Amino acid sequence: MIFQSWISKSAVAATLVLLALNVAHAQPLKNEAAAASNEFTPEVGQAGKDVIWVPTAQTLVNKLLELAKVTPKDILYDLGSGDGRTVITAAKRGARAYGIEYNPDMVELSRRNAAKEGVSDKATFEKADIFESDFSNATVITLFLLPSLNEKLRPTLLNMKPGTRVAANSFDMGEWKPDQTARVEGDCQTWCTAYLWIVPAKVEGTWKTANGELTLKQEFQVISGTLRTGDKSLAISNGKLDGERISFAVGVAHYSGRVNGDSIEGISIAGTAKTPWNAKRGK
């Protein structure tokens, strides 16, 4: 689901013409059976709370879940779940999947779709506002929102457990650059880019190590800083966070490890020598 409701009428009209031509195959017109049963059938461009609805092509749904490496061990939340296809696809992969959707008709449609696909036991849909919902137990978040809404969600996402995967259709997170990007073709004609972010651990600050004081600066998943040993201060390079995993270099030594709250444990490699290292966050 994309597009804020305040976009000008002419811009919306032009956009809908384009979308109707390119995604009509993904959004069939009301058929006789639906009309006869009075079941709700969504239409491309229908108004929503913050956005209008445009379906995500199934090939892109598959790519989003592939990038996020969704397994039966995951808990997935789709923020603005529309007709439920992302949630249903995740449930088919064995994940516990939840859709948060403001439109009650779309929620009921999603529940019917889940029942038809035989995954009602794993796919749950709730009528709610994504900005007022608690999805803190998620291991995977998926979304299809404008950048302004993504950025509004960004602080909440960054406060989630390190290693949580965030997969988005076509729109980015501003200064928080994606860890992976992929494009799909096939049945996808518009909005065909998949982005993946991995929520990084919070490491900015001073850490005590056996080799001296490690001072880290953090900008999302990128880290910089210095290691001070005695009267020497050495800059770190190639600093990166991948969820709880941290890596950087100091001179010829390459450090890797896992962040666990206020401690880090790992291995440093210099030439052929491998040495365990650990750090404690300064108080």
Segments from the language model and where they lie:
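C-terminal substrate-binding/active-site "lid" region of AdoMet-derived donor-dependent transferases
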Residues: 150-202
